[in-house]
Amino acid sequence: MAEKMQAIMKTKPAYGAELVEVDVPKPGPGEVLIKVLATSICGTDLHIYEWNEWAQSRIKPPQIMGHEVAGEVVEVGPGVEDLQVGDYISVETHIVCGKCYACKHNRYHVCQNTKIFGVDMDGVFAHYAIVPAKNAWKNPKDMPPEYAALQEPLGNAVDTVLAGPIAGRSTLITGAGPLGLLGIAVAKASGAYPVIVSEPSEFRRKLAKKVGADYVVNPFEEDPVKFVMDITDGAGVEVFLEFSGAPKALEQGLKAVTPGGRVSLLGLFPREVTIDFNNLIIFKALEVHGITGRHLWETWYTVSSLIQSGKLNLDPIITHKYKGFDKFEEAFELMRAGKTGKVVFFPHKG
């Protein structure tokens, strides 16, 4: 194994990132070193790349970016008993304390002291990466690395879609970015019908149809509320899944959901949002879920089973694959322009 490796690093508090050469790290107690087989870009990585207000408040350069990963264990640190060299793993990227009030009530996904790979510590946009053994998830040997790397964001989509009953229920999804596309795949695999997607990008509307959306609408050209009402004979949808983080999409979705329906919110809004709670939520008796992270480890079992079932239509979602990191800037700029689904790097070019 080489002593040096390439990594995409946030080297300074400014727009962009750099491809650097650094030492291959050594695992400490309770840690393993993985050879990164595949790693995908998340919206969080894009925020860090763009150096928005959230990134400025959270990230401390220099730091290796990235957290969605599939890899092979190549070295085991002291005290690790459940993993060995050669194990094929993905990683739960939220490192929880296990001691806070939430953790002691089995709500690990909302641990009050959560640390995140590639956010609070070095990440996985590299040839090799250190991960805590307790955060490893063993993958079936025949799972493609690009699928295995997507399990972490798929967990977000699964928790959003499956926060309540979905089979046979009319569903509106706002936002067909990478997470929204995963949400469409999960909703269709879980029996939702019809699945209606509101998305302004023509590129992503076409992707949504490929993944399985029954109807798509451009909210900049048509009123999505009227669109939904026409399809549902005026009833509105049973389920509203918000992936966009757009305040207007939230308002439209709340208007389009039927009284007594269910709402799951995953998209992060850029600012405080003003909503008519009385008329859009309280008087409609809506069931509203805020979604963050993944339930440990129930969601991982669900995600793995869905992938192995063959029912998830993931191939159209993975629109760009890169061997190595040489074109990482191109990948990020395409994502910024909304011209991708999921982007996956395969760090080892061979």
Swiss-Prot record:
Q: How does activity depend on temperature?
A: Optimum temperature is 90 degrees Celsius. Extremely thermostable. The half-life of the enzyme is more than 2 hours at 85 degrees Celsius and 24 minutes in boiling water.
Where is Zn(2+) 2 bound in this sequence?
97, 100, 103, 111
**Keywords for this entry?**
Cytoplasm, Metal-binding, NAD, Oxidoreductase, Zinc
Task: Name the InterPro entries for this protein.
Answer: ADH-like_C, ADH-like_N, ADH_Zn_CS, GroES-like_sf, L-Threonine_3-DHase, NAD(P)-bd_dom_sf, PKS_ER, Zn_alcohol_dh
Task: List positions binding Zn(2+) 1.
Answer: 42, 67-68
Molecular function, one GO term: amino acid binding
Please tell me where NAD(+) binds in this chain.
Answer: 179, 199, 204, 266-268, 291-292
Top enzyme class of this protein?
oxidoreductase
Q: Name one GO cellular component term.
A: cytoplasm
**Keyword Oxidoreductase belongs to the record:** yes
Active site: which residues? 44, 47
Task: From the UniProt record, list the reaction(s) this protein catalyses.
Answer: L-threonine + NAD(+) = (2S)-2-amino-3-oxobutanoate + NADH + H(+)
Involved pathway(s): Amino-acid degradation; L-threonine degradation via oxydo-reductase pathway; glycine from L-threonine: step 1/2
| Cofactor(s), by name | Zn(2+)
Major location category of this protein: cytoplasm
Q: How does activity depend on pH?
A: Optimum pH is 12. Is active over a wide pH range from 6.5 to 12.5.
Cellular location(s): Cytoplasm
Q: Name one GO biological process term.
A: L-threonine catabolic process to glycine
Cofactor stoichiometry and binding remark: Binds 2 Zn(2+) ions per subunit. Zn(2+) can be replaced by Cu(2+), Co(2+), Ca(2+) or Mn(2+) to some extent.
Q: Which PANTHER family match?
A: L-THREONINE 3-DEHYDROGENASE
Function, in words: Catalyzes the NAD(+)-dependent oxidation of L-threonine to 2-amino-3-ketobutyrate. To a lesser extent, also catalyzes the oxidation of L-serine.
User: Which HAMAP family does this UniProt record tie to the protein?
Assistant: Thr_dehydrog
| Family, per entry | Belongs to the zinc-containing alcohol dehydrogenase family.
**Subunit-level organization:** Homotetramer.
In its UniProt entry, what is this protein called?
L-threonine 3-dehydrogenase
